[in-house]
């Protein structure tokens, strides 16, 4: 979910940049269609 994603980003980046992922790729944000574009998008796909 988005809370877990925010926590993960905080641990890796040391700051909250989760808002930059809301419209990233095909699956980061709400819903999604098509093939995931990269590893980050695949992570969003798995958690959707």
Swiss-Prot record:
**Would you tell me the Gene Ontology cellular component terms?**
extracellular region
Under which main EC class is this enzyme filed? hydrolase
Q: What is its main location?
A: secreted
The EC designation for this entry is: 3.1.1.4
Tissues in which the protein is found: Expressed by the venom gland.
> What is this enzyme's catalytic activity, as reactions?
a 1,2-diacyl-sn-glycero-3-phosphocholine + H2O = a 1-acyl-sn-glycero-3-phosphocholine + a fatty acid + H(+)
Q: Return the InterPro entries for the record.
A: PLipase_A2 (IPR001211), PLipase_A2_dom (IPR016090), PLipase_A2_dom_sf (IPR036444)
Q: Which SMART domains match?
A: PA2c
Superkingdom of origin organism: Eukaryota
What is its subcellular localisation? Secreted
Any single biological process term in GO: lipid catabolic process
Q: Name one GO molecular function term.
A: calcium-dependent phospholipase A2 activity
Needed cofactors, names only, are: Ca(2+)
Residues forming the catalytic site: 47
What disulfide bonds does the UniProt entry report for this chain?
A: 28-44
Q: How does activity depend on pH?
A: Optimum pH is 7.0-8.5. Activity decreases rapidly at basic or acidic pH and is virtually absent at pH 12 and pH 3.5, respectively.
| Cell membrane listed as a keyword | no
Binding locations of Ca(2+): 27, 29, 31, 48
Give a yes or no for keyword Nucleus in this entry.
no
Stated family? Belongs to the phospholipase A2 family. Group II subfamily. D49 sub-subfamily.
What role does it play?
A: Snake venom phospholipase A2 (PLA2) that shows myotoxicity and induces paw edema in mice. Exhibits indirect hemolytic activity. Inhibits platelet aggregation induced by ADP and collagen. PLA2 catalyzes the calcium-dependent hydrolysis of the 2-acyl groups in 3-sn-phosphoglycerides.
**UniProt subunit comment:** Monomer.
Q: What is this protein called?
A: Acidic phospholipase A2
**Organism of provenance:** Bothrops pauloensis (Neuwied's lancehead)
What are the top taxonomic ranks of the organism?
Answer: Eukaryota, Metazoa, Chordata, Craniata, Vertebrata
